[in-house]
């Protein structure tokens, strides 16, 4: 929009090209990165992401030398509590974020300075010519004793009243946003077969008469599970977890949770 400043986002190694692109779009400036990715977040099933400290710091220093404005993402790692961790998707895959949002940030998840913090701090000192203030004392850590589980409660004995329906309902259909939804039906006698779930969002544990048969994971592109023979009528339970909502691009429109197909 005319008159409104524009910013550009990028990670390590993309600063020069990023600002060249921004200058073509907004030759009069201001020149700012809205998100300079100081690290990266993790998805379940992946290794922890890290970026090279020296390369990060050198690029950061170069941007300061050019007089560019830099908004660092993230400066302080964090934690996504509860079911609020989010997810990524390109429309075909599904990558749920971990609870930890440490991000390999200059300040880690517990608020402690990292080598990246020191490198960025030194870069600021060189550009400004100012001596940094002394760091505060490290945050004390404590080791807690192992807590033995004294009590537990069975899921099966604590289910809420069911919502009966002739068609599959999503979490949103029953005014639920996060957590778990349990689908239950009775299955007639029959030979071994296959359960096929179209549109699983996101992770299912499948039970036959309260015995775990297996799991189906959207993250792994799974949609099928072999079922054993049924000699007597059985209760089939499918416990579906919302593993995190995709929060950008047009994929948002398809992010209902539970069983979204058939």
Identify what each model region corresponds to.
Residues 1-72:
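Substrate-binding/catalytic cleft of secreted carbohydrate-active enzymes
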Residues 34-39, 63-68, 75-262:
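Carbohydrate-binding surfaces of carbohydrate-active enzymes
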């Amino acid at each position: 929009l005319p008159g409104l400043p524009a910013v550009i986002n990028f990670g390590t190694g993309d600063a020069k090209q990023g600002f060249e692109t921004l200058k073509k779009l907004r030759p009069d400036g201001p020149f700012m990165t809205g998100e300079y990715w100081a690290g990266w977040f993790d998805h379940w099933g992946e290794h922890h992401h890290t970026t090279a400290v020296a390369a990060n710091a050198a690029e950061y220093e170069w941007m300061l030398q050019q007089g560019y404005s830099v908004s660092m993402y993230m400066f302080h790692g964090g934690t996504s509590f509860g079911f609020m961790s989010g997810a990524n998707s390109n429309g075909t895959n599904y990558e749920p974020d971990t609870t930890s949002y440490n991000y390999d940030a200059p300040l880690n998840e517990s608020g402690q300075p990292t080598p990246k913090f020191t490198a960025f701090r030194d870069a600021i000192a060189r550009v400004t010519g100012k001596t940094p203030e002394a760091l505060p004392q490290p945050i004390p850590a404590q080791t807690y004793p192992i807590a033995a589980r004294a009590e537990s409660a069975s899921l099966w004995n604590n289910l809420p009243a069911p919502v009966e329906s002739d068609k599959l309902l999503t979490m949103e259909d029953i005014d639920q946003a996060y957590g778990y939804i349990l689908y239950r039906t009775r299955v007639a006698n029959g030979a071994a077969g296959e359960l096929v779930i179209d549109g699983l969002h996101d992770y299912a544990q499948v039970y036959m008469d309260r015995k775990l048969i297996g799991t189906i994971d959207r993250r792994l592109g799974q949609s099928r599970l072999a079922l054993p023979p049924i000699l007597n009528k059985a209760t089939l339970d499918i416990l579906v977890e919302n593993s995190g909502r995709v929060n950008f691009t047009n994929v948002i429109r398809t992010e209902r949770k539970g069983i979204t197909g058939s």
